[in-house]
Amino acid sequence: MLGNPSLLRVFLQHRVVASFEHRALPEKSYATVVDIGAHTGQFSLLIRARYPEATIHAFEPLPEAAAKFRTVFEGDPRVLLHEAAIAPASGETTLYLDGAWDGGSLLPPVSAVREVPVRAAPLEEFLAADEIQSPALLKLDVQGYELEALHGCHSLLERFDDVVVELMLVEDRAGQPLASDLIALLRDEGFQLVGLDAFGRRNGRIARFDGIFSRLHSTS
């Protein structure tokens, strides 16, 4: 971050740090990046720094996080924020917060500190197929809702070359899919696991990581 003046400026002004833990992203010049679970812009900042020509479509349903995201990317015409969650069906749903407002999920925790009504819809309600220009990257980090979010992307998954998704080895929330579930779904959609990144530990053991998937027959 210290070597990138724009990222340092964002940190000093907004206290938002780019997701530098994602070190294994494919070496491609992405034209389109879809950031589902954008929060305050950590991953989108990394993308803007690494792929400055990419158009970023970010999705963040939590109003406080979306407001911060807008201030971080104010004036950037290549970053488009959609204040919504991606889900298989359209409608209003509940975002559960089990602590600080950076930990929201559409899956209910054991005890929710706060419940927020949010808009949810499939990706196709926000983007047309021709808006996803190749090479294209899809990123999902939605606190246990990744499987349902992928179902919400189903009609447009063929437009993506690569997918980055958080994978869990242990269940944090009731009904949360584990790594094997997501790997199987993406395999059925024509993607192969090609890399691991951003490891998280619990009690000294790896509990989660980001899986990097590439299409077996790239769209680019």
PLM segments and residue spans:
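Phosphate/nucleotide-binding beta-alpha loop and adjacent structural elements of enzyme active sites
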Residues: 1-220
